[in-house]
Each structure stands twice: as C-alpha cells, then as structure tokens.
C-alpha cells in the first residue's frame, strides 16, 4: 500500500527530523534512554533481557560478514562504518530493536520507487546518505551502483528483480538498521532467499518455508481442519 505509506512517513519525518554526526552516534549507542527521534525501542527496562549478554559473548566467534562490510564503499567517510564494527570485524554497534525516523526515510524512498517516482525516491535516499556520509556525492540514475548478482536479496517486495535504485535503497537500509532487528523481516518480505550458516562443523540451511513458523501440534489437534504450514507436515 505504497500510496498510504507516504503521507504518514512524511508527517513523522517533519516532527522527528534526521540526526547526524555526534547526535546520531549518541542516539545509536545509548543503552538506557529513548533518544529524540526514536519512536519505539527494545529493552526499556535495564536488565529485563539477557540477549545483549548472549550476543556479546558470541561476537568474537561470529565476525561481521564481509559482504556487509563491502556495502560501505565510502569506508570511514560513512559514520556508520566505524560505528558498526571494528578492524577485527567484531560488531560494535549497540544491540537495540528500534523504530526511528531513518526508517521513515527509507520507507519513503522505497514507496516512491515502487510508484515509479524516481525523483522523489532519489530525494529521500540522498537525504539519508547526506546525513551519514561526509563528503557525500548525491546518487543520480546515472551513477547508481550496479546490482550485486551475489546479494542475498535479489527481488523486491513485489517479486520483481531489483533495479539499481531499489538495490541502493536496500543497501542503505541494511547499513542503517544493522543490529536493530530489521534484517530477518527484510529477507522475509523480499523473496525469502535461502542461505546457510555453519556451526560446530555442521551446515544449517534456511529454506523458504522456514520464514513461516510451524503451527503447534496442540493447536492442530484442537482445531478440526486446521492445516499445518507448508514444509512442516
């Protein structure tokens, strides 16, 4: 419903403009309070969840994927580069689920792109980049990066192959919302790509059907005619 996204996101953006520089870093790395343009955040009460402790203990053994690092073509000129990981490829960004104004900018860029309004799509894509990259070169239809054929996401939310513009929007979303609980949902709504990870010498494959959870056996037994989700029969 791309048309309805636009007025709502634009209204929120007027009230909660983008941060940049030190203000942005402070907002991202704050563990205790809800900063300025954050609408909703996880871990409102300190100590309410041990997920951060679990993640911290796993960081040395799970380096940041090189394909993600390669998205930062401007390197240190992008403030998110040093904020997200260190030279050992260890994650350094504070783990927090958030809904904040930067996501509204990304939603606007994507919505306008889906409506074939490339001028406004570029406007909002460049708005975000101008607040994160110094010095910054605006994207145009002519200088957009080529679509990476090896990227995990290869189709958009409508199932169409990614254009250069949509791929650039997806890349900015991945960089901006890293460690904020967004990536799984992006994979789910953009083609449900299959991938694998290794742990303890074993290969674990995420198949398309796994983006939907199975229905509990008790519910299947209690509700006559209820069908198990595909892949879990």
Predicted regions: what they are:
Residues 50-64:
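Active-site-adjacent substrate-recognition loops and nearby beta-strands
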Residues 1-49, 66-233:
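Acidic/polar-rich alpha-helix caps and helix-coil junctions
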